[in-house]
Amino acid sequence: MKALVILGLLFLSVAVQGKVFERCELARTLKKLGLDDYKGVSLANWLCLSKWESGYNTKATNYNPGSESTDYGIFQINSKWWCNDGKTPNAVDGCHVSCSALMENDIEKAVACAKHIVSEQGITAWVAWKSHCRVHDVSSYVEGCKL
């Protein structure tokens, strides 16, 4: 019985933590989902953005008290403009997706929303990209990934 309780707690902690991608695993996944050079944004830039936004963690969240909104998932997509979390005042839901869907281990919906965002606003919509990736050599993010 004690072993079942411990096993249950282990599974619960994995479910709450979500998937933290390895760098090259994420590179292959993003490439497969069509982000490599999407709207002129290189795969290395998407990896840099993901690293600085979420640490490659699908369950990452960040509350923004000023706008009463939350950033969700591997790309930290904001509930004020892009997804519906049911609690952000005057939310737009530009991607027509629930914010919880952006935190799934299968990142297909997060990628679809990221494509929508970059199509409308460009990669500069992400503050972390502007701060950590824009003027840097990001080639190391895909180095050795055998793409």
UniProtKB/Swiss-Prot annotation:
Its EC number is 3.2.1.17. Residues 19-147 form the C-type lysozyme domain. Keywords: Antimicrobial, Bacteriolytic enzyme, Digestion, Disulfide bond, Glycosidase, Hydrolase, Secreted, Signal. Residues 1-18 form the signal peptide. Monomer. Lysozyme C is capable of both hydrolysis and transglycosylation; it also shows a slight esterase activity. It acts rapidly on both peptide-substituted and unsubstituted peptidoglycan, and slowly on chitin oligosaccharides. This is Lysozyme C-3. It comes from Ovis aries (Sheep).
